[in-house]
């Protein structure tokens, strides 16, 4: 399931930049990518609360898969038909609302079936990355890097995701007799998790790191093409190779290293990744693409495992949903609009000033690294915990309020 889900997501996001350019929709590109950010402010928390309290995550993902297939097909048709840009953006936003909760719901499904998430989640999550790569390669094999065919293929892939959900055992959903307030129905009570200082640092670091990272898919393909590298979707998938390697090795790292140093290493690789791209050469840019995957894993996947280990079972779908809001929502929205403005600032009459563009992003990641090293306390510290794993009230769905050491 993770494999096919990754393919469906990759077949839309990776070629989107070049597909919009090929159909004369370059002007809406920053807003098209920002649609994911807007959607992540709304749908992940709502569907996360639904999966925690009302419906099985498997059934939620099944419905989302069908909705994604329909929305992606409509959005692709509007791009191909060169409809009014506002209509195109509206349909892209509709698709974003359907796709934003999918990965956090899928992660919740997987975590619920693992005996040892630290050791097992990385390799299983790698299947999504393999699917992402396969989706990119299929797009390039179909010569659809700039074609609407990429979107139609992705829509069909979402239907395959739906089919896979019928092979999953539906686990019982934790029940609560408490009458839910409107903010609980919308999943806004997940914000309680931010009361824990270490939780807050992990959420904020992930969100801040997302801001410069959003430049990867809109602008790296453009730089690759300017350097004479065609089949950009396939070249971009190089980053997933190191992502997979890192995922298979992450379990061993979590046993030997503190979370603080794993995340710090990922952030440091993020600085190096953008610094290499700033050299403005084929080999250097490709080296930066390769490092992207390793950096991504050490920050984001570690954060997801942290949440599964430190958040009570009745809150885990909302915890993963809040992670989606902070990264896909807050981080992506600020990132796509901010890097779009930064890209325009770096534009010159003879072309983009790529060294300046990538160097600015490297500096931004360096600031995030410094913040994390200073603010995260970790092992040996005791803080007020929202939804901690030993919180009996949280396990019943009531507001959590416990003290627990955070590693």
Spans of model-derived segments:
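Helix-loop boundary and gating motifs at the non-cytosolic
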Residues: 1-39, 198-237
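Hydrophobic core of transmembrane alpha-helices in multi-pass small-molecule transporters
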Residues: 3-4, 71, 84-104, 109, ...
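Intracellular juxtamembrane helix-capping segments at the cytosolic ends
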Residues: 16, 99-115, 298-312
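Helix-to-loop junctions at the C-terminal end of transmembrane segments
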Residues: 42-56, 143, 245-259, 343-344
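A membrane-interface helix-boundary motif in multi-pass transporters
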Residues: 57, 141-158, 340-365
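C-terminal ends and interior cores of transmembrane alpha-helices
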Residues: 66-82, 268-280
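Multi-pass alpha-helical transporter architecture, strongest
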Residues: 74-79, 160-173, 357-391, 398-400, ...
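Juxtamembrane intracellular "pre-TM" segments in multi-pass secondary transporters
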Residues: 169-204, 391, 398, 402-403
């Amino acid at each position: 399931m993770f494999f096919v889900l990754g393919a469906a997501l990759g077949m839309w996001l990776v070629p989107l930049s070049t597909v919009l350019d090929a159909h004369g929709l370059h002007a809406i590109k920053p807003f098209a990518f920002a649609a994911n950010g807007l959607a992540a402010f709304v749908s992940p928390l709502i569907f996360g609360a639904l999966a925690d309290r009302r419906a099985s995550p498997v059934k939620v993902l099944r419905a989302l898969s069908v909705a994604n297939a329909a929305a992606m097909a409509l959005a692709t048709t509007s791009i191909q038909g060169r409809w009014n840009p506002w209509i195109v953006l509206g349909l892209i936003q509709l698709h974003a609302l359907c796709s934003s909760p999918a990965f956090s719901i899928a992660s919740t499904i997987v975590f619920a079936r693992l005996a040892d998430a630290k050791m097992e989640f990385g390799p299983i999550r790698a299947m999504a990355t393999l699917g992402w790569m396969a989706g990119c390669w299929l797009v390039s094999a179909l010569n659809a890097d700039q074609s609407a065919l990429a979107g139609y293929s992705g829509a069909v892939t979402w239907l395959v995701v739906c089919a896979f959900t019928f092979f999953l055992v539906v686990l019982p959903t934790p029940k609560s007799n408490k009458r839910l307030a409107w903010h609980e129905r919308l999943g806004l009570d997940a914000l309680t998790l931010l009361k824990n200082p270490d939780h807050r640092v992990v959420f904020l670091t992930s969100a801040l790191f997302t801001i410069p990272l959003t430049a990867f898919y809109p602008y790296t393909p453009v730089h690759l093409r300017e350097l004479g590298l065609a089949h950009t979707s396939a070249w971009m998938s190089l980053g997933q190779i190191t992502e997979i390697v890192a995922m298979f090795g992450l379990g061993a790292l979590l046993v030997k290293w503190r979370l603080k140093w794993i995340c710090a290493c990922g952030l440091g690789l993020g600085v190096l990744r953008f610094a290499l791209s700033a050299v403005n050469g084929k080999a250097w840019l490709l080296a930066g693409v390769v490092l992207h995957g390793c950096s991504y894993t050490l920050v984001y996947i570690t954060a997801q495992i942290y949440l599964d280990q430190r958040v009570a079972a009745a809150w885990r779908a909302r915890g993963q949903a809040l992670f989606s809001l902070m990264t896909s929502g807050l981080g992506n929205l600020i990132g796509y609009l901010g890097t779009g403005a930064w890209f325009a600032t770096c534009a010159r009459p003879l072309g983009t000033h790529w060294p300046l563009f990538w160097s600015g992003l490297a500096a931004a990641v360096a600031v995030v690294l410094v913040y994390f090293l200073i603010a995260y306390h970790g092992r040996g510290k005791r803080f007020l915990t929202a939804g901690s794993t030993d919180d009996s009230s949280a396990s019943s769905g009531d507001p959590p309020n416990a003290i627990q050491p955070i590693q």
